[in-house]
């Protein structure tokens, strides 16, 4: 396995000084270390496409190569700027992508990751993105990383490090840097239990990716409730509000639809709030549980505690 600290220092020795992306469970040890030590040159982005955009801006300002990290499920968000801006036929922007390989063939994973893992390398090939696989062999992987950086530099093009499961050893990072986060994480499950008790029994529930959907499933089990009214958005992070809005628009108007969302999900595709807020009818209800972090993939902080969601919601057309 790769030691996150030593690997980080090795990458720094190759003149990679800026890091941005969206946290991933397979990369959580590396991302956790970066988050602990890089207070100035590290940005947790709203989504993977935004991370690529930030990396482009960094390169334009410095001519250096940024590292962009993400889970492979986030490649969809990154495709547009990678193809329409970074590609050698457009602006030819070099960057090093670090992509966690969820759903890697032959390795057990959650159902929503299996197809993504199976088609990922084919996707990269179709996009003409040269990839290099990181398996957790420190001698081989250091050389592989240098090859990837050399490729990005010489070809002025993105190169992809595909990181296998368990490539990084565990790192005990400071994943809760704020007492508010610690409190919010502990209280989320209790809040969900109260929400499920209070909403109408026949209401439809659309829940966001990560811990919220997992805990709703577990709470329903504990209450001996059925799951037929719930749509657990296990993939497609950031799209729960849009799904709930679409459902509320065409379901019987007498039936309520509750979107139970998280801060990381809302931030990822915040523009969707303008649609659900302005066009949503009285049967659409949007509940945000803000714990200030990406809890299910390592606990790295979001900027959510610095957002005035009440004012934002009013501006987006929501009624209180």
Residue spans for each PLM region:
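Thiamine diphosphate
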Residues: 1-154, 159-245, 249-255, 303, ...
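Short, function-defining helix-loop hinge/capping sites that tune catalysis or transport
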Residues: 65, 271-273, 298
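DG-centered beta-turn motif at the end of beta-strands
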Residues: 70-73, 255-266, 271
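Short, catalytically relevant binding-site loops at active-site mouths
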Residues: 75, 212-213, 239, 264-267, ...
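A short alpha/beta connector and helix-capping loop motif
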Residues: 83, 92-95, 269-290
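Phosphate-handling active-site elements
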Residues: 250-261, 281-283
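A contiguous pocket-lining binding segment that forms or flanks enzyme active sites
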Residues: 283-319
């Amino acid at each position: 396995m790769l030691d996150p600290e030593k690997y980080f220092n090795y990458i720094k020795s190759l003149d990679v000084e800026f890091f941005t992306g969206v946290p991933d469970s397979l990369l959580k040890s590396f991302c956790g270390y970066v988050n602990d030590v890089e207070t100035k040159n590290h940005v947790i982005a709203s989504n993977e496409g935004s991370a690529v955009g930030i990396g482009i801006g960094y390169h334009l300002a410095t001519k250096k190569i940024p590292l962009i990290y993400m889970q492979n499920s986030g490649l969809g968000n990154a495709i547009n700027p990678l193809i329409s801006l970074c590609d050698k036929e457009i602006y030819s922007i070099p960057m090093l992508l670090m992509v966690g390989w969820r759903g890697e063939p032959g390795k057990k994973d959650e159902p929503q990751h299996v197809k993504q893992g199976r088609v990922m390398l084919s996707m990269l090939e179709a996009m003409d993105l040269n990839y290099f696989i990181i398996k957790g062999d420190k001698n081989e992987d250091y050389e592989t990383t240098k090859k990837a950086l050399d490729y990005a530099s010489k070809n002025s093009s993105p190169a992809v490090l595909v990181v296998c499961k368990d490539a990084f050893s565990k790192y005990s990072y400071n994943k809760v840097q704020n007492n508010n986060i610690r409190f919010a994480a502990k209280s989320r499950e209790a809040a969900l239990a109260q929400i499920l008790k209070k909403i109408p029994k026949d209401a439809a529930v659309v829940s966001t990716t990560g811990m919220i959907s997992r805990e709703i499933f577990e709470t329903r089990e504990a209450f001996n409730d059925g799951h037929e009214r719930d749509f657990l958005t296990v993939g497609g992070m950031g799209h729960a509000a849009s799904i709930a809005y679409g459902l509320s628009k065409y379901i019987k108007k007498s039936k309520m639809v509750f979107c139970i969302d998280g801060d990381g999900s809302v931030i990822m595709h915040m523009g969707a709030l303008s649609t659900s807020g302005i066009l949503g009818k009285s049967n659409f209800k949007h509940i945000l549980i803000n714990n200030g972090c990406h809890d299910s993939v390592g606990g790295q902080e979001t900027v959510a505690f610095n957002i005035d969601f009440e004012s934002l919601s009013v501006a987006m057309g929501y009624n209180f």
